[in-house]
């Protein structure tokens, strides 16, 4: 009977876990819907920002690329890269499948790829899970910030990017990229790598263009061309990180929803298996008792 008691306890424990994972799935589903809406609105703003870039650059096209002196802009094909800063985004929490692991693997792969080319790499981390991983493995992370990937905040992004931009403009780094796990759809996430500094002259054509129904933006630049581009570039790099955080958060909720759904289904299967084992053990116990009773009756005859 001790075996039956153990199985009953296991069934009860698994059912409790099943309730928890199901509740977490529902919470993640709700958060995902909200995150999707924020991502759509943010994407609309990003497209408008791209349109402003396109408009300003088109007005300057007759000047020639060599006339643009802004340090934010470079011809990427001709740029000699010796130092790279990688900004990675992971979640602050776990229980989201391979969401964090896939991002970390990509960061390590990019780091090794650059080092093979004798390019110095510095890491800047956003998200507790990624920061903990690199700290545990003795890998230096220049800047660490937690509780931002779970709660994107533009003011904190500006503060974080201020150091990044200062290092870039002062020549401490030649290139800045963002690596994060992005939202593709309800069941799919994809690793995204984006160069935010320097801004290539063809950067606008690398991004999806506004639809034909989207409002056309017209602008008349005031001030020097470089001042205009610098002002736009600052907003561009800040919003690139902010949008990556929003995109990452939507992907995180999607990954957690799937992970909890899988855990719930596995719990259901385990309950079925344990129930079968319980019924078999119970039947064996009943059979054993009947045999013992019959044996006792026969002994009394």
Curated annotation (Swiss-Prot):
GO biological process, one term: proton motive force-driven plasma membrane ATP synthesis
Pfam families, per the entry: ATP-synt
InterPro entries tied to this protein: ATP_synth_F1_ATPase_gsu (IPR035968), ATP_synth_F1_gsu (IPR000131)
Keywords: ATP synthesis, Cell inner membrane, Cell membrane, CF(1), Hydrogen ion transport, Ion transport, Membrane, Transport
Gene3D superfamilies given in the database record: 3.40.1380.10, ATP synthase, gamma subunit, helix hairpin domain
Main subcellular location: membrane
Gene Ontology CC, one term: plasma membrane
Compartment(s) of residence: Cell inner membrane
GO MF assignments: ATP binding; proton-transporting ATP synthase activity, rotational mechanism
PANTHER family attached to this UniProt entry: ATP SYNTHASE GAMMA CHAIN (PTHR11693), ATP SYNTHASE SUBUNIT GAMMA, MITOCHONDRIAL (PTHR11693:SF22)
Family the entry assigns: Belongs to the ATPase gamma chain family.
Name of the featured protein: ATP synthase gamma chain
Lineage of the organism: Bacteria, Pseudomonadati, Campylobacterota, Epsilonproteobacteria, Campylobacterales
